[in-house]
């Protein structure tokens, strides 16, 4: 948490920014936006072997209850407005994790007329997880990188 000082009487001094960011990293609630085979790996990461619950990550069915969107799979042009609409319904602060080659840049279908060449053209992306499909370990590493990014953000001074 970055505690600056611990006094002898049991007091801890720190900044409000660090406390807020610490609480946000321990309670990420992702909204699944599974579009293709990467969604299977995302479900695998939520199962008992990797157990995202131990990191405080609980998958939510509604965008109004979530603060992290995991875009997993090929995003087509018809699905792009729905992705933006779901993103706009999420509460602030919100983060986006792009999972897989198709979500990152179109992947195997990059030159298709109906595929968006990266979900970052529709919503701002915070973390990219490469792979086709990326493993559950790669998704877990991407979530840990997002938690590190959240810890470094300046919350109150915005």
Swiss-Prot record:
Family: Belongs to the complex I 20 kDa subunit family.
Lineage: Bacteria, Pseudomonadati, Pseudomonadota, Betaproteobacteria, Neisseriales
SUPFAM superfamilies per record: HydA/Nqo6-like (SSF56770)
Compartments, as annotated in UniProt: Cell inner membrane
Catalysis: reaction(s): a quinone + NADH + 5 H(+)(in) = a quinol + NAD(+) + 4 H(+)(out)
Gene source species: Laribacter hongkongensis (strain HLHK9)
Iron in keyword set: yes
Purpose: NDH-1 shuttles electrons from NADH, via FMN and iron-sulfur (Fe-S) centers, to quinones in the respiratory chain. The immediate electron acceptor for the enzyme in this species is believed to be ubiquinone. Couples the redox reaction to proton translocation (for every two electrons transferred, four hydrogen ions are translocated across the cytoplasmic membrane), and thus conserves the redox energy in a proton gradient.
Name of the molecule in the record: NADH-quinone oxidoreductase subunit B
